[in-house]
């Protein structure tokens, strides 16, 4: 099985497990997507680099501990708790799913360490880049694949707050340059 095929298998398996978990809990559907859109005062090429390179990620989000390989099957690992035990540092094990240069970047994401029951399951994050006049970029982040039940509700509530903060941090990073 190729690495890309394995990625798709892992995603489908994670979503099936989430669905079965939700069904076992009496839920009918997965939780709604999280969608955040920002207009960034930078050209698409700069915003793209901010998301697809370790240096870019470190410039607005993660401390000096990011591993980003912007190819399908490549790593998308950000460590927020550098001194935490292995598996509890950040997005260890998360992978890039799809890359359409300067248009779309898709990666896996996991629950924070405080929610261990679903930490090995993954959601997907889609970033869509749209060029605007005056060297600006409309960036839309869509995070989906949340199951239902208490742990998934905690995870979703966390990222309902976290993703807008991350996007705001990116916006400020480029506003500071303008």
Predicted regions mapped to residue ranges:
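Short beta-edge strand/loop motif at the mouth of beta-sheet-based domains
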Residues: 55-91
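Bacterial N-terminal signal peptides
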Residues: 10-22
